[in-house]
């Protein structure tokens, strides 16, 4: 299983890339929701790290995934 970070901040994404985590930078709610759906369908990602702003933009979708799926584990970072 892979780990990925969905970030709204380029600096956060770069820092996590240096630690070996794949990252994407997205700032649009619809794109984030679509990306989360893709992650669930592909079933390759075990952990999704999201920044605070991403969580706030897509709180309902993230909580739905947390409540209805064992994977991926979604972790918020500041």
Residue ranges and their predicted role:
Residues 1-27, 33:
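N-terminal first-folded block
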